[in-house]
Amino acid sequence: YSVTRQTGSTIKPIGAYALGIEYGLVNWSTMLNNSPLYQKQDMVIRDEDYCRKNGLMGLSDKQLRAYPNAWRSWPRNYGGNYGDNSDIPLWNGLARSLNTIAIRVGDLVGASNIFNFVYNTLQLNTLDPVNDVGLAQMVMGSQTHGVTPTALAAAFQIFYDGQYTTPHLYTRVLDRDGNIYLENNATSYQALTPDTAYVMNRLLKNVLYSSVGTAGGRYPNSNGMESFGKTGTASDEKDLWFVGGTPYYVTAVWWGYDAPYDMTKTLGKQQAKTRTCVMAWKALMEQVQADLPYKA
């Protein structure tokens, strides 16, 4: 729970989407274009594979402009497609975890605003203040070190009522006479407005309950209580995530190796993308909530 890993797409809701709604820049049904933010001809993003194969890695961006094929469109969606250039509603893009949609929201919000929010307000302080202030890091989740499962779970608690409480393992320790021996004064504060938290909660419900969601149909059966969540896959499928919330709990599930390794080589691409982490979370929630009373 204390090892840092790249977040992949799990950072999208706590940064770009939450702030986009909080700032009034987007809403549930905002139409966004399903295409790369930067096209190859814009010469903004290097094609590192091409540059490496052709001995161009040492060239500056200015020098590289002489090589049109040294650039690529960015970003791609999971699986390598660049979208279909259609306009789709925000809720659909989030449910499907489309990078092409999230990056447009992130561009509206601004990478520095996202970083300041997740680093300072949500206390994801293992992020790098020098190297992680960019759209690739703040929207796509390709950070220098990443964050811990504990910190990521704590960040997602804001989607209940907008409040953030610092993670803690105990509240107090009493001696045998009932006197307080140790007290852990956790800090709580409002990170988002309740209205934004509610909209985000409903948006993230689609990940589990919509037929287009990346974890569609894999919500826990817990006495009719609803859930929300977000899948995540880091670069080269070395880190798999699911962060899910219920009216009682927020839980982060990370799946990977101590020495990072492509999980699709052992699990298969579809299993790695959509099933492993969310099914572990689903089984856990059904067990721990089995005897709990209904809570909205």
Annotated model-derived regions:
Residues P129-G146:
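A glycine-rich, coil/turn loop motif that links secondary-structure elements
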Residues Y1-I14, S29-M31, Q137:
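Short active-site loop at a secondary-structure junction
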Residues M31, N92, A102-G106, F117, ...:
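Structural recognition of the beta-strand scaffold that forms the well-ordered cores
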Residues Y1-V3, T7, H145-A296:
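A penicillin-recognizing enzyme superfamily signal
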Residues L25-I114, L135, R176-N206:
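Conserved catalytic neighborhood of penicillin-recognizing serine enzymes
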Residues Y23-G24, L37, Y248, D258:
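Solvent-exposed coil/turn segments that connect beta secondary-structure elements
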Residues V109-L127:
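Short, charged, amphipathic alpha-helices and their helix-cap/turn boundaries
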Residues I21-T30, N125-P129, D161-T166, D291:
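Secondary-structure transition/capping motifs at alpha-helix termini
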